[in-house]
Amino acid sequence: MAEPVRQELSALAAIFCGPDEWEVLSLSETDGAVFRILTKAEGFMDTDIPLQLVFHLPLSYPYCLPGIVVNSKHLTRAQCEIVKEKLLEQAETLLLEPMVHELVLWIQENLRHILKCPEAGGGSEKCSSAASMTVDDGLWMTLLHLDHMRAKAKYVKTVEKWASDLRLTGRLMFMGKIILILLQGDRNDIKEYLILQKTCKVDVDSSGKKCKEKMISVLFETKVQTEHKRFLAFEVKEYSSLDELQKEFETTGLKKLFSECVLRLVK
């Protein structure tokens, strides 16, 4: 399997890291990769419709279209087929580059328009029954761990730019060898940040050559709760001790997160 495809799979796994959002179904040196993504897209009356998207990336991908299967309990079989056709039409405009995340974002933004088309049955009863599934994503929070930064100044500047461009707030935190990024914002914007982090050359390797980030992990992701502090900006902070870092988490309402996810990094 080509390295760019492996990198795309790695980025997708980091982005779709919620419960049951991502599953690799098969990996083969002869047949390529097959994986499943669970997501939601806005349907009729601002209701969220759960979608199961199965992608098959053949060995010639991204020089050819991926195979796509669409399933949803809240859409008819005919509607699922129309959604698949529209996704493939969009994929034709993205050939020669990694496209899966772009396709997921596209269907999230365009499903309601597709379902309004006459061939999709307009406002069918099957779709309107999803009214009870309405979910307001609101503000989300993600904690990331970086293994190292060799080109620290450039890396920090890049992270600050991404956070600003995507309207994300939070902290880039340094304490000894520990590097953490705490992000707050729209869930799709956080996922877009993750794909940038995974696919752009943000650091240098041991020989000084520019390289992509391969050692990032998502420690935690949740919807922001009432006890969590809302950050007004994205700031870079350095801490001289573990106690000082712990106090930052405690004042943010994340004491449990610190004990469960951060402490194990220093053990």
Swiss-Prot record:
InterPro entries attached to this UniProt entry: RWD_dom, RWDD3, UBQ-conjugating_enzyme/RWD
GO biological process, one term: negative regulation of NF-kappaB transcription factor activity
Highest taxon of the lineage: Eukaryota
Primary localization: nucleus
Sorted UniProt keywords: Cytoplasm, Nucleus
Gene3D superfamilies, per the entry: Ubiquitin Conjugating Enzyme
Localization: Nucleus; Cytoplasm
One cellular-component annotation, GO: nucleus
Keyword Nucleus: yes
Coiled coil spans: none
PROSITE patterns: RWD
Residue intervals of the RWD domain: 7-114
Subunit structure: Interacts with UBE2I/UBC9, NFKBIA, HIF1A and NCOA2.
Domain notes: The RWD domain is required for the sumoylation enhancement activity.
Described function: Enhancer of SUMO conjugation. Via its interaction with UBE2I/UBC9, increases SUMO conjugation to proteins by promoting the: binding of E1 and E2 enzymes, thioester linkage between SUMO and UBE2I/UBC9 and transfer of SUMO to specific target proteins which include HIF1A, PIAS, NFKBIA, NR3C1 and TOP1. Positively regulates the NF-kappa-B signaling pathway by enhancing the sumoylation of NF-kappa-B inhibitor alpha (NFKBIA), promoting its stabilization which consequently leads to an increased inhibition of NF-kappa-B transcriptional activity.
Protein name in UniProt: RWD domain-containing protein 3
Organism: Bos taurus (Bovine)
